[in-house]
């Protein structure tokens, strides 16, 4: 019967050891991410103008009368700084202001990361797939900062990239494709 408390104690100590190892890994990940973020900000390789280009509401998830009322030409502008890491992956910090679906101003600011591939013999052609994390502020949410975590993809040639994301949602809400041009200066 004395074996049971010893086993419980060993299991508890084992779990604490795993938690400690996990915490150390998490702390290292946060530290590495912060270093990467600060490097982009303090040592950018390029300064990038952004031109919002397309807002497209998924026709399978919206009623036609809603789509007819929405703006799908998001004129606006933005800017950012970016950096390619040792592996050739793109990292950037950005801010954009554009006219949203209701033709009201929307702001979005954040950090983006893309794994970059160069699938052709021409090294100037590139594809990217990654994520963006940041905050957005819209008129219909009283410009309260709302956190966002979205997929990010791109196709580009030399210093110009067409970047895009998809905002998931429910019927008649969300389910929006948003794209913009980014030049690396």
Curated annotation (Swiss-Prot):
Give the family per the record: Belongs to the lipid A palmitoyltransferase family.
Record-annotated active site: 57, 100, 101
Q: Give me the residues lipidated as N-palmitoyl cysteine.
A: 15
Which positions does the site annotation Role in the phospholipid gating cover? 171
For this protein, the record's PROSITE patterns field holds: PROKAR_LIPOPROTEIN
Keyword presence, Lipid biosynthesis: no
Q: What is this protein called?
A: Lipid A acyltransferase PagP
Lipid anchor positions (S-diacylglycerol cysteine): 15
Q: Name one Pfam family in it.
A: PagP
| One MF annotation (Gene Ontology) recorded for this entry | acyltransferase activity
**Gene name of the record:** pagP
The protein's organism comes out as Erwinia sp. (strain Ejp617)
Tell me, in a sentence or two, what this protein's role is: Transfers a fatty acid residue from the sn-1 position of a phospholipid to the N-linked hydroxyfatty acid chain on the proximal unit of lipid A or its precursors.
Q: List the catalysed reactions.
A: a lipid A + a 1,2-diacyl-sn-glycero-3-phosphocholine = a hepta-acyl lipid A + a 2-acyl-sn-glycero-3-phosphocholine; a lipid IVA + a 1,2-diacyl-sn-glycero-3-phosphocholine = a lipid IVB + a 2-acyl-sn-glycero-3-phosphocholine; a lipid IIA + a 1,2-diacyl-sn-glycero-3-phosphocholine = a lipid IIB + a 2-acyl-sn-glycero-3-phosphocholine
What keywords sit in the KW lines? Acyltransferase, Cell outer membrane, Lipoprotein, Membrane, Palmitate, Signal, Transferase
Gene Ontology biological-process entries: lipid A biosynthetic process
Q: Where is the site labelled Role in lipopolysaccharide recognition? A: 66
Membrane topology, record value: Lipid-anchor
Q: Which cellular component appears as one GO term in the record?
A: cell outer membrane
Q: What is the lineage of its organism?
A: Bacteria, Pseudomonadati, Pseudomonadota, Gammaproteobacteria, Enterobacterales
The answer to whether UniProt assigns keyword Lipoprotein to this entry is yes
How is this protein organized at the quaternary level? Homodimer.
Which residues belong to the signal peptide in this entry? 1-14
Which Enzyme Commission numbers does its entry carry? 2.3.1.251
Entry's localization field: Cell outer membrane
């Amino acid at each position: 019967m004395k074996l049971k408390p010893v086993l419980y104690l060993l299991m508890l100590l084992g779990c604490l050891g795993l938690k400690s190892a996990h915490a150390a890994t998490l702390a290292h990940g946060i530290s590495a991410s912060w270093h990467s973020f600060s490097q982009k900000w303090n040592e950018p390789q390029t300064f990038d103008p952004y031109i919002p280009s397309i807002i497209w509401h998924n026709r399978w998830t919206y009623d036609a009368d809603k789509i007819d009322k929405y703006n799908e030409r998001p004129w606006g502008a933005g800017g950012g700084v970016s950096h390619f890491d040792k592996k050739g992956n793109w990292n950037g910090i950005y801010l954009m202001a554009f006219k949203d679906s209701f033709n009201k101003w929307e702001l979005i600011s954040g950090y983006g990361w893309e794994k970059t591939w160069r699938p052709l013999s021409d090294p100037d052609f590139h594809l990217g797939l990654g994520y963006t994390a940041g905050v957005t502020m819209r008129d219909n949410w009283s410009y309260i900062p709302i956190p966002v975590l979205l997929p990010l993809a791109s196709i580009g040639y030399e210093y110009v990239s067409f970047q895009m994301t998809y905002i998931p949602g429910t019927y008649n809400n969300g389910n929006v494709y948003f794209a913009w041009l980014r030049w690396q200066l």
